[in-house]
């Protein structure tokens, strides 16, 4: 298997893997229910104006007291860190604290990009403390934070392992040299299904296309991610749209996909829009199939004790993105955060983390370490995808500030059934 970190670089993997063909319990808990959708609509209504240029110089970084305070507050997505077998410790994080002398308060309160931004918007705009020195937003939100000058520039001199960022993750339009953001894990969006229930209901072994989700036998048993870029992206790809291109995936094209999804929801083809709480729905057989994140499916099978669920990228393609490390402007322990980022860019630590979280590792050398750790793991294309696999993935194009607002509003209304 070819090491995925040797992939050629392509200018639109702004958000993860630009080579991916220019047609181009777990991590998340996204917007759930009317309250969450309301938060998204509220966020859209107050989305900041701006452009895709360089960060604003208006805000001044908080004074870094890392040399005198060996502490760090890291707010991450739920279930996005390795655990011991008894789930009482976090081996890689514990080792970092022992080796560095930095005490880490690890929070799992980053439940959704829109929700987190909405709650912390005023502090971000003012450059004040958001309750964490280090956060891991998804690329699209990170691009906004960089654009609006709300995160600090990192000191690469403090991160010797910065050189281990896989080439495919460099060149993002909003942060070409990864001076403000450093990839944490890559994310795939595709289709999952309960193998036994799907066959029992449809007579087929597995779905093959996005359209198979709308079979009448599955009415009321299909879930979509509440993360717009994944659900809309996968469905748009099935319609032959190039979600990486603003000339193909125009606002009119987006609205056409939104209308399709609204119709499917009204006809009960879609049961719900959810974040990773959909795992509970699959576990209790409420959901039979849906558009989900790949790493969650690996975790679901682990919890089930056998390969209960299948996951695939349809021939029309799946979505790809990344969550990134970044330091908010009001954080006071940037140097400590840089030490932690550097630690997780050691290939040994990256491989150990990947073995548990089951998302794509962006670290050069992690594949070779994974072979030593677990050869079977190293051959898992959902964690170490090869070039052929990535050719069927597509990065959702960057949106202007105006598009962010209109797209989020439309998506929120769909989830409300409006």
Residue ranges and their predicted role:
Residues 221-227, 231, 235-239, 244-312:
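Ligand-binding pocket segment of bilobal, Venus flytrap-like solute-binding proteins
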Residues 1-25, 36-41:
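N-terminal secretory signal peptides
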Residues 47-55:
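Bacterial lipoprotein signal-peptidase II cleavage site
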Residues 59-60, 65-143:
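Early extracytoplasmic/lumenal segment of secretory-pathway proteins
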